[in-house]
Amino acid sequence: MIITLKDGSKKEYSEAKSVIDIAYDISEGLARAACAGEVNGEVVDLRTVLDKDCELNILTAKDEKGLAVLRHTASHVLAQAVQNLYPEAKVAIGPSIDTGFYYDFDHEPFSREDLDAIEKEMKKIIKKGAKIERFTKSREDAIAYFKEKNEPYKVELIEDLPEDSEISFYSQGDWTDLCAGPHLMSVKGVKAFKLLSSSSAYWRGSEKNAMLTRIYGTAYATKDELKEHLAQMEEAKKRDHNKLGREMKIFTTVDVIGQGLPLIMPNGVIMMQELQRWIEDEETKRGYVRTKTPLMAKSDLYKISGHWDHYKDGMFVLGDEETDKEVFALRPMTCPFQYYVYKAEQHSYRDLPLRYGETSTLFRNEDSGEMHGLTRVRQFTISEGHLIVRPDQMVKEFKDCIALAQYCLQVLGVEEDVTYHLSKWDPNNREKYIGEPEVWEETEEHIRQMLEELNIPFTEDVGEAAFYGPKVDINAKNVYGKEDTMITIQWDALLAEQFDMYYIDENGDKKRPCIIHRTSMGCYERTLAWLIEKYAGMFPTWLCPEQVRIIPISEKFNDYAGKVEAQLKEEGIRCSVDGRSEKMGYKIREARLERVPYMLVVGAKEEEEGKVSVRSRYLGDEGMKDIGEFLGALKEEIKNKTIRKIEVQEEKK
């Protein structure tokens, strides 16, 4: 048996060997640090026995996959601790996630004091150092085992598996869980962990099911790594848009209105309007024409497009197909509406490409458990557009869509924060998609070649395509490390036929166009959340709800402050006067806390000379300036959408 290691070196054995034995054969230090093995790309237990040639990578907590195994084991220690302290608690599921792990329990909510007690119990379990053992049962025996333990959620999971399934279990001491693994060799490997919070979550993510209590935690190989992560989490909490966006009066939510339906407050509306005007202007420069289409349509439209068969569960349906003559649905996308704009008149090959843009309000029936601030909502606004093109124009137009997205990211100052993904179909799950395999393979290859030609690093994600075509997803992480899609550009070689769309070619024949579905900047609400967290609320000046705060040093200079305000407003600057009888230092600190980029202090000298004393978040005290001089520089900064560097230390905090 020849084992090929990650560095290309080979180990030869005359008999079967476990992964941990091979790790010890390489070095004792590696074996002690090992969390799991990766055999031919599959993550397996260290206890897994190898008996044939393969490629092997020993995973430690320094590897993402190895750290995930450590965290998965931590979730089992958590579940054991909870059931030790609260025997009535029923266990559901407990996976590792990007930032740690969680476990769901059928139990009343846990307080911070409860979490502290659970942590202590986890430390006791870890100190005992029980070995982790894997064993299997038949499906029938596994169901009987968990029925006897009165664990209904485990029973339900097993009952969903095929009858001939071999069910995998992991035990640590006297506690056992249903699990596919892999896991560490012993609970002793969980050396640095922290329980972070407790929240509610529906069983299997559906609001039709029982509400469970979820405990979140994180774990690392060392206490220093954990300490660093917790410090980052504290900073993340300060930037969390769900907290900061409310404090800055950008948005709020109200229970009686519903989850996923945020109220955008006046400050948020200002920002969205600025973004919308900019995006629409940029699209107009690039030859887009605007449409305005209905918020709903009959089910007939979605049956033609395929959304009724492939996306109905994600739509808000109005009416009952069995009893109502007509059933409507709120639109989850704009594409079929813009197709009928195209079909309203005949087009020749000379008319193409046609680029339709619309600032659309869309509706998607997300699960309640998925709702979060502005990033996951049920009604949202998006810079949507569809390009109807000849096949020979497809590559150029698709590249131009990528270029527009990159330009928008650059202007917003977030181009270095994103990752690119080629989202492909899953040929093993064909019922999710329309079209033939060869069409999918061809269109995916076109996108792959384009990304390579543009020197854009990307990953390929199987099963993430839309049901009608592959796409480029441009993703970004929030402050907690969760990745969201910000911008999407899709290649569609199928829906033109569904809608009988055509153009007349140079020979007078009807030909099918191709379609590009794209966004310039994506969902406005999600972009707002992204910008709040990126800038910790200290937005570039052009986006700030309030750009200038005028601060008279005493009430007797309020009239002059009012004149300065009028002059700025005449030039389109968003500003206000703080004419209260508070101390000037207090008013300056308050303006800073409210993240106003410029403060203009006015007193006797400023009034006498017709000037203002400028204090900015960027440089601090910028000295006394003519109003015209300040205004000219400010207008230029806003026009160019400049992102000024913050150089004053107190503003960075």
Regions found by a protein language model. Give the residues of each.
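NTP/phosphate- and nucleic-acid-binding module
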Residues: M1-A92, I97-K653
